[in-house]
Amino acid sequence: MSEDRELQALLRLTAWLSPAFPIGSFAYSGGLERAVADGLVTDAASLANWIGTLIGHGSVWNDAVLLTESHRRQAEAPGLAEIAALAEALAGSRERHQETMLLGEAFLLAARAWPDEVFERLPGKTAYPIAVGAVAGAHGIGPEKVLAVFLHAYASQAVSSGIRLGVAGQKDGVAVLAGLEEQIAGTARRAAASTLDDLGSATVQADIASLRHETQTTRLFRS
């Protein structure tokens, strides 16, 4: 990739996965709010552990694998439809399904500012990692770069949620992000070489928290 293309890729990833991109990710905690209410996440250290575990072994890892496969299949409408259906099926709760589908829909709507035929190949309703992977692949951005920024965006949003929930301050939140850098980079490299055989998670408490959040009466977040 030429220097100009490298800069273009960086700018597009920064735009697409920025908190300012209009997809509404700030409204979701992915079960973190319930984990805080249940005393599973109480401070910056446990917040970092929660985020890191999901990235390495939970739903975020599965999202990274799905993103990679979508990136590979971006030129094939049937292949995208198949992986999109799998992504929906892997959503472990009603709120998790709602989150990934609404984020995916909003991402595709906003990303049309960068026209490409990939939008016609994707299903009308598409899970978030499928949308990101296909669009990035269609624009010639390498999977490892996409994954690194995608995972960092997740971590940043989760830290922001933790700050809003009162388990960490802003200074602690920045330290959490800094501490996760090595894991994010390693997971991006691992996911870039993954296949669907690598799907799987071992984060039962996080899955239960996502389910329990559905009946939580007082809340800040939609998931």
Swiss-Prot record:
UniProt keyword annotation of Heme present: no
Gene3D superfamilies on file: Urease accessory protein UreF (1.10.4190.10)
Domain of life: Bacteria
Intracellular or extracellular location(s): Cytoplasm
GO CC annotations, alphabetized: cytoplasm
Similarity comment: Belongs to the UreF family.
PANTHER family (alphabetical): UREASE ACCESSORY PROTEIN F
Protein name, entry field: Urease accessory protein UreF
Organism (species): Rhizobium etli (strain ATCC 51251 / DSM 11541 / JCM 21823 / NBRC 15573 / CFN 42)
